[in-house]
Amino acid sequence: MKKTKTYQVFCIAALSVLTLQLINGSSAATPPPPNSNSSTSCNRACGGVSIPFPFGIGKDCYLNGWYEVICNTSTSGSSGTTVPFLSRINSEVVNISLPDGKKLYGVVHIKGPVTSLGCSSSSSSSQVSEMSLPNLNVTGRGSPYFLTDENCLVMVGCGTKALMKDIESEILGCESSCEDSKSSEEVTNSKCDGYKCCQARIPLERPQVIGINIENTSATRGKEGCSVAFLTNKRYAPMNVTEPEQFHAGGYAVVELGWYFDTSDSRYRNPLGCRNMTRYSSYSSFDKCSCEYDYFSGMSYRICYCNYGYTGNPYLRHGCIDIDECEGHHNCGEGTCVNMPGTHSCEPKITKPEKASVLQGVLISLGVLLFVLGILGLYKFIKKRTRIIRNKNFFKRNGGLLLKQQLITKNGNVDMSRIFSSKELKKATDNFSMNRVLGQGGQGTVYKGMLAEGRIVAVKRSKVVGEGKMEEFINEVVLLSQINHRNIVKLLGCCLETEVPVLVYEYIPNGDLFKRLHEKSESNDYTMTWEVRLRIAIEIAGALSYMHSAASIPIYHRDIKTTNILLDEKYRAKVSDFGTSRSITIAQTHLTTLVAGTFGYMDPEYFLSSQYTDKSDVYSFGVVLVELITGEKPLSRKRIGN
């Protein structure tokens, strides 16, 4: 008896030291939760047992010392086998599970000790009690563990009783006896109800277990033999009477410990993103996890779990992931399973009549689409055909047939460099914008344009002309197509597809000679020296000489004046505007036409005879020479009195 009291004092002292350590360990601040992808370097399994956070193996892989797991090499199993141990309580781990919606605390199953009496040769005749070491003291201050109500005290043996004790007194116990009157079959099939086996439930209000004591109640200890007692989960408790030697040989019993993780610290709880819940409140299927208050052993705490439809670890950021209910067995039957966040839905299966309706709808939609596309195609075809017919009519009206006739008459000597489309010229001149106008004359308006290849051109859009004046336009085209002289503006091409005919010339950047002689402005900064005036006169004379003598057919300009003399970038003279020009054959000395030209530059004999000759162009050139020398206009009100 004295030995028993001494042992109890030793247990109390050991428990006091352990309690002080727990108090110190519990004062540390709760660290922030790790990310679900941040602990990939941590080993999360040992000996086939999954080790989820807050448990962990190795530094920085567990929450605190209570959750540290040590992966040791087994001494009893095969070579190289590892087994997990909870460091603080020095117990081998069987499995660990996280809280869920059904059970608000986590569960860890450990291997607990088996207390025996009379099961070895050394103690087979002993009459004293035997007590297990206090290694089930898992519920001290700061400990997250507690014995769940799924455990019970089991004793197997004859003439003995088992007592479970805590730091204060005995908590509970049970007693078994053996009767020789029962047959062997009755013993094997009997339940653990007092005959050779007894068990007792553990009250949750007294959870601090120090050890299990076995005492002999029989006067003949040697006859009763081996007895064992242990704590175990009810699932592992013996359903039928089993020989105590089997439990003694096994050396352990599976004990269920509940564990909680106090997340009342908002610094830890908020990053989890879990919804705060109260008991029996509802949550959305989009809420992956929930946290709620619970109460145990005089202390309230908050615990988290993955909601229904999600799985994973609620103590990790983004640790709860959606369960795809459609992958495995589902309750949709013949319907189609559609996975959704936290749940799933069953869509009705499309039957054959419904398929026919869908196919019919698709065909109708396709038919309508093809009909609309056909209408659009027909509209584009008609529009294109109309444009082609309109362009042909414009070509015919603008003298296209007359131009072809002229080409045949000239034996193919006309070399048209390019035929422009109306679309191309509209783009080049911004649809003949007024901002692009370079000048206007008796024959039309000239626009500045830029072709697609970047070349700057002058686009002359003729005024609306009747069929009687169409010959003048074609005449200008034919004449300029024959001319190839550096002092005559070159025709680049024409367009007859527009409402009015269009000619495209090379662009002459410095305007006409009239402005240089008579208009004083900041832009006219070029000095018209005598050398320049002489050079311009020579260049004009050369151009007239070419037209009168060197061209394949002699050409009379009939409107030589300073406004028709353009200046290029080097201020070289370029004769332009051939709208009133005429070509003559060798047998024809003159043409009788309407009066053409500009007053002040016209030959007086032309008024009397109406016969225009090369001398008429020379007379107009003489007026230009006087204009170059004197700087005076041919007609001036200042000279009327003189």
UniProtKB/Swiss-Prot annotation:
Residues carrying a glycan: N37, N72, N95, N137, N216, N240, N276
Region of interest: Atypical EGF-like: 289-346
Alphabetized GO MF terms: ATP binding; polysaccharide binding; protein serine kinase activity; protein serine/threonine kinase activity
Claim: Membrane is one of the keywords in the record: yes
Organismal lineage: Eukaryota, Viridiplantae, Streptophyta, Embryophyta, Tracheophyta
Modified residues (Phosphotyrosine): Y505, Y606
Transmembrane domains' residue ranges: 358-378
PROSITE patterns according to UniProt: PROTEIN_KINASE_DOM, PROTEIN_KINASE_ST
Catalytic reactions on record: L-seryl-[protein] + ATP = O-phospho-L-seryl-[protein] + ADP + H(+); L-threonyl-[protein] + ATP = O-phospho-L-threonyl-[protein] + ADP + H(+)
Topology class, membrane: Single-pass type I membrane protein
Main location: membrane
Gene3D superfamilies associated with the record: Laminin, Phosphorylase Kinase, domain 1, Transferase(Phosphotransferase) domain 1
Keyword Transmembrane helix carried by entry: yes
Keyword terms, alphabetized: ATP-binding, Disulfide bond, Glycoprotein, Kinase, Membrane, Nucleotide-binding, Phosphoprotein, Serine/threonine-protein kinase, Signal, Transferase, Transmembrane, Transmembrane helix
Signal peptide extent: 1-28
GO biological process terms held by the UniProt record: cell surface receptor signaling pathway
UniProt function note: Serine/threonine-protein kinase that may function as a signaling receptor of extracellular matrix component.
Entry comment, domain topic: The EGF-like region is specific to this family of proteins and seems to consist of the C-terminal of an EGF-like domain fused to the N-terminal of another one.
Name the UniProt record assigns to this protein: Wall-associated receptor kinase-like 6
EC number: 2.7.11.-
GO cellular component: membrane; plant-type cell wall
